[in-house]
């Protein structure tokens, strides 16, 4: 067992906590999104985030209300709908609607920043990284997570088509799933490292998480979860009856995924802890 594997196991042991991050996500989100966000929320419990904290791509603020016990200082997002939802949740002291490539903040204003499953959706990610570096103090931590190079090859339907010799169809399926996931970047650390260094960040540590069988649950959840999408569009809520009894079976199905060690070499997402260069 190599040093990196031992370090990954230590990370997971440290991030085990008695707080339940699964249920607060499960009662508000489709189950396939809930399990991923619950795993990610657990990682942040060992990440030091000195104030003021910037959340790059805060969305509707749902994740921040669950992952952090205190309000984050500033949430930034380019879309008005999610910003208004975030305001209603009270997850941030201040909310700003702006493009991440043109932030309305002075140089070296923030002491830390996060971006949870956001950077993969941004075509101009290099510009956003440069702006994030600009508004961070020298030495400030920047923590984020993104899907990686394992994501698309691991999709179950694509792999099944590969085994049948239908590689062209498999690649078309992967392109389709990437499109509905709104991904512009599913890159390995070898791509992220020079990208971050060019923007002025140094990677302190990273790990892959969310194993293939967990991705398959997420993948099929996109199809089985279509009723939740209809509910969201008609009522504004993903889950119409967010009660323990209604979601008991769903919770039981995904509980093992939440409780198992999510850190693995073939994980399809990567968690990065970086620091603004001095």
Language model features with spans:
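Active-site beta-strand termini and strand-to-loop segments that position acidic
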Residues: 274-277
